[in-house]
Protein backbone atom coordinates (compact mmCIF):
# COMPACT_ATOMS: atom_id res chain seq x y z
CA UNK A 1 0.00 0.00 0.00
CA UNK A 2 2.82 2.40 0.86
CA UNK A 3 4.57 1.63 -2.42
CA UNK A 4 1.42 2.38 -4.44
CA UNK A 5 1.00 5.69 -2.60
CA UNK A 6 4.62 6.54 -3.34
CA UNK A 7 4.15 5.59 -6.99
CA UNK A 8 1.05 7.76 -7.31
CA UNK A 9 2.81 10.69 -5.65
CA UNK A 10 5.75 10.28 -8.00
CA UNK A 11 3.50 10.11 -11.06
CA UNK A 12 1.55 13.20 -10.05
CA UNK A 13 4.77 15.09 -9.35
CA UNK A 14 6.24 14.14 -12.72
CA UNK A 15 3.01 15.08 -14.49
CA UNK A 16 2.99 18.47 -12.82
CA UNK A 17 6.67 18.98 -13.69
CA UNK A 18 6.15 18.29 -17.40
CA UNK A 19 2.98 20.36 -17.50
CA UNK A 20 4.88 23.30 -15.99
CA UNK A 21 7.61 22.88 -18.63
CA UNK A 22 5.04 23.15 -21.40
CA UNK A 23 3.18 26.06 -19.81
CA UNK A 24 6.44 27.92 -19.20
CA UNK A 25 6.45 28.65 -22.93
CA UNK A 26 3.05 30.39 -22.64
CA UNK A 27 2.65 33.86 -21.10
CA UNK A 28 1.63 33.64 -17.45
CA UNK A 29 -1.67 35.43 -18.00
CA UNK A 30 -2.75 32.88 -20.61
CA UNK A 31 -1.50 29.62 -19.10
CA UNK A 32 -4.44 29.03 -16.76
CA UNK A 33 -6.93 30.26 -19.35
CA UNK A 34 -5.58 27.89 -22.00
CA UNK A 35 -5.86 24.97 -19.59
CA UNK A 36 -9.60 25.54 -19.56
CA UNK A 37 -9.64 24.62 -23.27
CA UNK A 38 -9.04 20.94 -22.46
CA UNK A 39 -12.65 20.08 -23.47
CA UNK A 40 -11.71 21.28 -26.99
CA UNK A 41 -9.09 18.53 -27.26
CA UNK A 42 -11.18 15.92 -29.07
CA UNK A 43 -12.23 18.44 -31.71
CA UNK A 44 -8.87 20.15 -32.35
CA UNK A 45 -7.17 16.74 -32.50
CA UNK A 46 -9.69 15.45 -35.06
CA UNK A 47 -11.48 12.93 -32.84
CA UNK A 48 -14.85 14.74 -32.75
CA UNK A 49 -16.95 16.25 -35.53
CA UNK A 50 -18.07 19.23 -33.43
CA UNK A 51 -16.69 20.95 -30.33
CA UNK A 52 -18.40 20.08 -27.04
CA UNK A 53 -20.44 22.77 -25.27
CA UNK A 54 -17.88 23.09 -22.39
CA UNK A 55 -15.27 23.83 -25.08
CA UNK A 56 -17.39 26.63 -26.52
CA UNK A 57 -18.13 27.98 -23.04
CA UNK A 58 -14.40 28.10 -22.19
CA UNK A 59 -13.54 29.64 -25.56
CA UNK A 60 -16.19 32.34 -25.09
CA UNK A 61 -14.92 33.08 -21.58
CA UNK A 62 -11.34 33.44 -22.82
CA UNK A 63 -12.50 35.66 -25.67
CA UNK A 64 -14.43 37.96 -23.35
CA UNK A 65 -11.75 38.13 -20.63
CA UNK A 66 -8.44 38.00 -22.50
CA UNK A 67 -8.77 38.03 -26.30
CA UNK A 68 -4.99 37.94 -26.74
CA UNK A 69 -4.97 34.46 -25.17
CA UNK A 70 -7.45 33.35 -27.81
CA UNK A 71 -5.13 34.84 -30.42
CA UNK A 72 -2.24 32.89 -28.91
CA UNK A 73 -4.27 29.70 -29.12
CA UNK A 74 -5.38 30.31 -32.72
CA UNK A 75 -2.08 31.59 -34.13
CA UNK A 76 0.48 29.62 -32.15
CA UNK A 77 -0.97 26.16 -31.70
CA UNK A 78 2.56 24.73 -31.74
CA UNK A 79 3.17 26.32 -28.32
CA UNK A 80 1.25 23.51 -26.62
CA UNK A 81 2.06 20.73 -29.09
CA UNK A 82 4.46 18.69 -26.93
CA UNK A 83 1.67 17.78 -24.52
CA UNK A 84 -1.41 18.75 -26.48
CA UNK A 85 -1.07 18.34 -30.26
CA UNK A 86 -3.45 20.68 -32.04
CA UNK A 87 -4.55 20.73 -35.68
CA UNK A 88 -4.44 24.46 -36.41
CA UNK A 89 -7.01 24.19 -39.20
CA UNK A 90 -9.48 22.66 -36.76
CA UNK A 91 -8.58 25.20 -34.06
CA UNK A 92 -9.38 28.03 -36.48
CA UNK A 93 -12.85 26.53 -36.97
CA UNK A 94 -13.70 26.83 -33.26
CA UNK A 95 -14.83 30.50 -33.15
CA UNK A 96 -17.45 30.16 -35.93
CA UNK A 97 -18.66 26.81 -34.61
CA UNK A 98 -19.00 28.27 -31.11
CA UNK A 99 -20.69 31.47 -32.36
CA UNK A 100 -17.79 33.66 -31.23
CA UNK A 101 -17.15 36.71 -33.44
CA UNK A 102 -13.48 35.92 -33.87
CA UNK A 103 -11.70 34.20 -36.72
CA UNK A 104 -8.20 33.83 -38.05
CA UNK A 105 -8.24 37.44 -39.25
CA UNK A 106 -9.27 38.62 -35.78
CA UNK A 107 -5.71 38.25 -34.57
CA UNK A 108 -2.62 39.43 -36.34
CA UNK A 109 0.31 37.04 -36.26
CA UNK A 110 1.19 37.79 -32.66
CA UNK A 111 3.70 35.71 -30.80
CA UNK A 112 3.50 34.42 -27.21
CA UNK A 113 3.56 37.33 -24.81
CA UNK A 114 3.21 39.90 -27.57
CA UNK A 115 0.05 41.91 -28.13
CA UNK A 116 -1.38 42.03 -31.63
CA UNK A 117 0.37 44.57 -33.84
CA UNK A 118 -2.81 46.45 -34.78
CA UNK A 119 -5.25 47.56 -32.11
CA UNK A 120 -8.15 46.86 -34.48
CA UNK A 121 -7.03 43.29 -35.13
CA UNK A 122 -8.81 41.91 -32.07
CA UNK A 123 -12.54 42.31 -32.22
CA UNK A 124 -14.07 43.58 -28.97
CA UNK A 125 -15.99 41.05 -26.90
CA UNK A 126 -19.75 41.01 -27.44
CA UNK A 127 -21.53 43.58 -25.28
CA UNK A 128 -24.57 41.46 -24.56
CA UNK A 129 -25.10 37.83 -23.69
CA UNK A 130 -27.67 37.36 -26.45
CA UNK A 131 -26.68 35.00 -29.25
CA UNK A 132 -23.83 36.33 -31.35
CA UNK A 133 -23.58 35.93 -35.09
CA UNK A 134 -21.18 33.44 -36.63
CA UNK A 135 -18.30 35.31 -38.20
CA UNK A 136 -17.47 34.05 -41.68
CA UNK A 137 -14.66 36.54 -42.25
CA UNK A 138 -14.40 40.27 -42.62
CA UNK A 139 -17.60 42.02 -43.73
CA UNK A 140 -16.98 45.74 -44.11
CA UNK A 141 -13.21 45.78 -43.77
CA UNK A 142 -11.65 45.67 -47.23
CA UNK A 143 -8.08 45.28 -45.95
CA UNK A 144 -8.76 41.93 -44.27
CA UNK A 145 -9.72 38.94 -46.39
CA UNK A 146 -11.85 36.07 -45.15
CA UNK A 147 -9.89 32.90 -44.47
CA UNK A 148 -11.15 29.74 -46.16
CA UNK A 149 -11.83 26.79 -43.91
CA UNK A 150 -10.49 23.41 -44.98
CA UNK A 151 -11.49 20.08 -43.49
CA UNK A 152 -8.54 17.96 -42.44
CA UNK A 153 -8.43 14.35 -41.38
CA UNK A 154 -7.00 13.50 -37.96
CA UNK A 155 -3.28 12.85 -37.81
CA UNK A 156 -2.75 9.10 -38.09
CA UNK A 157 0.45 9.25 -36.03
CA UNK A 158 -1.29 10.63 -32.96
CA UNK A 159 -2.12 7.98 -30.38
CA UNK A 160 -4.90 8.85 -27.91
CA UNK A 161 -4.29 12.54 -28.54
CA UNK A 162 -1.00 12.57 -26.69
CA UNK A 163 1.29 13.02 -29.67
CA UNK A 164 2.91 9.62 -29.28
CA UNK A 165 4.65 8.61 -32.48
CA UNK A 166 5.01 12.08 -33.96
CA UNK A 167 8.17 12.67 -35.92
CA UNK A 168 10.27 14.69 -33.57
CA UNK A 169 13.76 14.88 -32.27
CA UNK A 170 15.51 15.43 -28.99
CA UNK A 171 13.80 16.19 -25.71
CA UNK A 172 10.43 16.97 -27.31
CA UNK A 173 9.87 13.32 -28.24
CA UNK A 174 11.16 12.24 -24.82
CA UNK A 175 8.60 14.49 -23.15
CA UNK A 176 5.85 13.08 -25.36
CA UNK A 177 6.88 9.53 -24.54
CA UNK A 178 7.01 10.35 -20.82
CA UNK A 179 3.57 11.94 -20.91
CA UNK A 180 2.22 8.93 -22.80
CA UNK A 181 3.74 6.58 -20.22
CA UNK A 182 2.27 8.62 -17.37
CA UNK A 183 -1.14 8.60 -19.00
CA UNK A 184 -0.95 4.83 -19.41
CA UNK A 185 0.30 4.10 -15.88
CA UNK A 186 -1.74 6.58 -13.85
CA UNK A 187 -5.17 4.88 -14.28
CA UNK A 188 -3.69 1.50 -13.32
CA UNK A 189 -2.01 3.02 -10.28
CA UNK A 190 -5.28 4.62 -9.18
CA UNK A 191 -7.01 1.24 -9.33
CA UNK A 192 -4.51 -0.10 -6.78
CA UNK A 193 -5.73 2.32 -4.15
From Swiss-Prot:
Species, as recorded: Arabidopsis thaliana
Keywords: Cell membrane, Disulfide bond, Glycoprotein, GPI-anchor, Lipoprotein, Membrane, Signal
Lipidation (GPI-anchor amidated serine): 168
Pfam families: LTP_2 (PF14368)
Region (Disordered): 109-140
InterPro entries attached to this UniProt entry: Bifun_inhib/LTP/seed_sf, Bifunc_inhib/LTP/seed_store, LTSS
Underlying gene: LTPG10
GO cellular component: plasma membrane; side of membrane
Annotated protein name in UniProt: Non-specific lipid transfer protein GPI-anchored 10
Xref: CDD domains: AAI_LTSS (cd00010)
